[in-house]
Amino acid sequence: MSSSEAEVDISVVSSPEPSPLGAAARDSPLLARSPARSADGSSPPATPTHRSNTPNTAAGTPTTSASGGNHFHHSPSGGAVPPAVLHHHLQHHLSSLGSHPVALHHALHTFGHLHPAHGATHPALLQHALTPTGQQQQQQLQVQQQHQQSHVERLSPPMKSPERNGGDEVQGHSLNNNNSKALNHNNTCASAAAAAAAAAVAAANLSNNSNDSNGSSGGGGGKSTTGSNGFTSFSISSILSRSEPAKKNGAAGLITPIPQLPQPGAGGPQDAAMLSRLGFISQWGALAGRYAALCPPGWPWAPQRLPFHSPTHDSSSTNTTENPPSPTSMSPNNNNNNSNTTASSNQASKSPSHHPLHPLYHPLGSQQQQQQQQQHQQHPQQQQHPQQQQQQHPHQPTTPTSSSSSGGGSSLTHHPHPHLTGSHGGYLLPSSSNESDEEGEEIIEEDDGTDGPSDSSSPHGDGNSKRKKKTRTVFSRAQVFQLESTFDLKRYLSSSERAGLAASLRLTETQVKIWFQNRRNKWKRQLAAELEAANMANMAHAAQRLVRVPVLYHDGTTAGFVPPPPPHHHPMQYYAAARNTSPPRPPLSSLV
């Protein structure tokens, strides 16, 4: 075995971090049956000599490889991946990572991707690595036959997903995260459906602990080694530690995409591999944002290409879907604030009702969540602001409940409008309507008049003149009766009469003046309505009279015009007498 293969085998296994499953991980089915684990919990080191022809399988029974005396090396020009090498690599990862479901996928992706030409044999190789069959020669011949195209198609984008199509079966056994479910529904290749049973068997034997997001980075060790076949063996912790995409061997250092995503286009197929691997731990909002900061703006991070939107609206999926125009907006700063506000985002990705801070606003993006974090800091200021308004108007007996409702209403209605900050958040429509409803039953020096004094123009002292809040003064029946009686006597009051009436009714002069103004406006409206009704009645009556006017002459007569008769005679008598040539006509009343 060459040094490159040894480097690939040890890259993910030699991790200084403990397994996230702890001692309980030793009870998993594949690990219990794996004899390759040593006493100290580490995997056996990969020797630089030739591999034995009898590798240990997952069942623990040594089988004789059908490859004979052939030994496999990783040459720089690229070589085939034999079943024994794949199985041995899977043994390393399963023994070191504690049979985690993410560890199995990570082991498959880390050991090197089969290229698009190998799509038909990859499920068989996976089946051989878990349950050995007697078809190893046939699989090896197929791998060697397709090896000739491996160096050409090394960086080509993949066509289908051989191991992730069994996601619907995997959901029943190992609780996969939501973003991998969304990716499973997008891939509908018919030929890739044959690998569903093998992937289901592989994942059903694993422990049901895939929600632990530390499992995918527990075996990383922060090491990223580039093999000779054009793939990159990487760990999740290496993404967090690096500052830019590492390119060690030129074009061979590019990340080969794993075949499980729909084609994002020619904008960058190498990005799809990293994003799909991040799909395993999508509840890590900070990790996804860290990689998004490293992507150039032209790479496909838009939701119409990579639908990483989970149905439960977890925090990381909303970061990738709510801000599609700017890929740089998902910087680590945004996601750090997001992770601060959502302290338990791993639990929130499975049950959105257990969201710690804001269960009502799951579909909000990262910018609005930052705005919400600022809102919690500005909330005491907004509660103090209505109290300052009360100090400006001491004659208004505003209750403390109105200020609390104003502060609460501003904190709830502030999120759909993130551009409103400070004191403007308290002046949105729900909070203002709450205040007006509570203050509507109180006697305030203001009515709905148009020319009130300056002290009753508006309770807002910050210059917000767009919407003036009008409050209505409630008068008793005795006060209204006295005011109406005075208005029937005099439409306008002098200053002395207004002062005396206000003193007798226990009102202020301003309230009496505004009431008389409103009453005069109402009286004028009533007069205008009555005049309009009278005019309409007169016009209708005039129209009726125009219709009933009698015809005094005929168009075909040769005689001259006859003057109208005296009032005591019927007009038809003289009309018929003047026309001797025409026959007599009945009176007009019989015609009408």
Swiss-Prot record:
InterPro entries: HD, HD_metazoa, HMX_Homeobox_TF, Homeobox_CS, Homeodomain-like_sf. GO terms for biological process: cell differentiation; negative regulation of DNA-templated transcription; nervous system development; regulation of transcription by RNA polymerase II. The keyword Nucleus applies. One of its GO terms (cellular component) is nucleus. Residues 468-527 bind DNA. Residues 435-450 have a biased composition (Acidic residues). Keywords: Developmental protein, Differentiation, DNA-binding, Homeobox, Neurogenesis, Nucleus, Transcription, Transcription regulation. Residues 52-70, 135-149, 173-183, 315-351, 358-405, 451-462 have a biased composition (Low complexity). It is found in: Nucleus. Pfam families: Homeodomain. The keyword DNA-binding applies. GO terms for molecular function: DNA binding; DNA-binding transcription factor activity, RNA polymerase II-specific; RNA polymerase II transcription regulatory region sequence-specific DNA binding. Residues 1-83, 132-183, 248-269, 305-473 are annotated as: Disordered. Residues 161-171 have a biased composition (Basic and acidic residues). It comes from the Eukaryota. Its main location: nucleus. Transcription factor involved in specification of neuronal cell types. When expressed in mice, Hmx is able to functionally replace both Hmx2 and Hmx3 mouse proteins. Belongs to the HMX homeobox family. This is Homeobox protein Hmx. It comes from Drosophila melanogaster (Fruit fly).
